[in-house]
Amino acid sequence: MGNQEYHEPVLADATTSLLVTRPGIYIDGTLGGGGHSLELLRRLDALDGESLLVGIDQDSYALEAAGQKLQDFGDKAILLRGNFSMVRELLAPVKRGPGEGLEVMGLLLDLGVSSFQIDTPVRGFSYLRDGPLDMRMDPDGPLTAADIVNDYEEQALARLFFRYGEEAHGGRIARAVVSARSVAPITTTGGLAEVVRRACPRKDSPIKTLSRIYQALRIEVNDELGVLQQALEDGFAVLSPGGRFAVISYHSLEDRIVKRFFSARCTADWGPKGLPLREPLKPAEAELVTRKSVQAGEAEVSRNPRARSARLRVIQKL
């Protein structure tokens, strides 16, 4: 797996400049090809003091590519296989070993699918490239998109397309899927794309509909929203005071979860309105570093179109 197969990291300069404040442990919970980690290591090298980069990814191919990209940094980078929702568990032996005595000063989650995964037909993420209907970010995961498309009942499919894809015609597309699979199982990305195209109303863009349907299936296969919520909880827990948490999201479902979590941590609890309290029942646990989400500029979007929908939010633990 060559490094060139992975995309340019989105919002790399903004993310790393906002995240790196002082030496310590920095966690890239979505390592991918190592683009963000490379920029983090370069910034950490410029600081006085000992630092350690911990990269996490559930995809063994990503770990291989990142390992090649970061090899010049030697033992300053530790790469671990696992889901970023397991950050607390994965970090524990690091804190007892090479990271002993270091505080966790930064955590990054880039929630996008890597271009390598999208562009590799056998991974089954894209409607533009025919391949097995898979969509597992962890190649060893138990559930595939084909399982969902061929086994879920029509009502469950419609609910899935509407909830995770925000697709207004989810019911219509679910009926088309059930009808098509009654003739023969739908086992390829191209086969599903053809079913969706035929079911898509003429006035609607088939590309946008396909994007929403494939997003819904990918979220379900990988339990992305549940994993994100767990990662936010555990990620914030492992941060040391003064540590920063940065998340890059790509669609409204993710961004709402991140925004709500960050807002809750940055808000003191004063109890019911009207209580004569001098101090909050529960003080704020963090403060906003970015008041609004940071977005890519025109120059970056022209170089890297996938940056167009990216939203970066950062908080600092108190």
Swiss-Prot record:
GO BP annotations, alphabetical order: rRNA base methylation
GO molecular function: rRNA (cytosine-N4-)-methyltransferase activity
Reactions catalysed: cytidine(1402) in 16S rRNA + S-adenosyl-L-methionine = N(4)-methylcytidine(1402) in 16S rRNA + S-adenosyl-L-homocysteine + H(+)
Function, in words: Specifically methylates the N4 position of cytidine in position 1402 (C1402) of 16S rRNA.
SUPFAM superfamilies documented for this protein: Putative methyltransferase TM0872, insert domain, S-adenosyl-L-methionine-dependent methyltransferases
Signal peptide stretch: none
Keyword Hydrolase assigned: no
Similarity section: Belongs to the methyltransferase superfamily. RsmH family.
UniProt subcellular location: Cytoplasm
tRNA processing found in the keyword field: no
Coiled-coil zones: none
InterPro entries xref list: RsmH (IPR002903), SAM-dep_MeTrfase_MraW_recog (IPR023397), SAM-dependent_MTases_sf (IPR029063)
Positions with a binding annotation for S-adenosyl-L-methionine: 34-36, 57, 91, 110, 117
Keyword terms, alphabetized: Cytoplasm, Methyltransferase, rRNA processing, S-adenosyl-L-methionine, Transferase
Gene3D superfamilies hit by this protein: Putative methyltransferase TM0872, insert domain, Vaccinia Virus protein VP39
GO cellular component assignments: cytoplasm
Stated name of the protein: Ribosomal RNA small subunit methyltransferase H
Entry EC number(s): 2.1.1.199
A Pfam family assignment: Methyltransf_5
